[in-house]
Each structure stands twice: as structure tokens, then as C-alpha cells.
Amino acid sequence: MIVTTILFPEKNEKKIELQENSTALDMLKNLDLNPDVMLVIRNEVPIPVDEKLEDKDVLKIVRVVSGG
């Protein structure tokens, strides 16, 4: 399956091929991104990393930053 990812705040868009039944975690690993500091959004709703993805999904990936 092919999914489109958009990494924020850079707005880098990339199409990647994943195996069927891949999860958001699989996608993050494929992109070499740390799942502990990333939020995956599909259809304007955050999804858990164990959520299965579907062909032609468009996923926004946001780096979670905290400070003090």
C-alpha cells in the first residue's frame, strides 16, 4: 500500500510504500522517526501508533515538543 506522509513543521511530503496491515508505528520506523516524540494524525484526528493504516491514507506527523 502507498501512504502519503507530511512531516510538520517542515511540511515535507513523502509517499512511502508499506506492507498491507502496517501500523502507524511501522510507518514511523520506516521513516526513521522516534514514535515516543511523534503524533500521527489522520483525517484531523490523532491515532494511536498501533492503528492499522489503509492504502492512500494521508498522515500528518507532528513532532511533540515540551519545555520548562
Model-assigned labels for residue ranges:
Residues 1-67:
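Ubiquitin-like/PB1-type beta-grasp interaction modules and other compact soluble beta-rich domains
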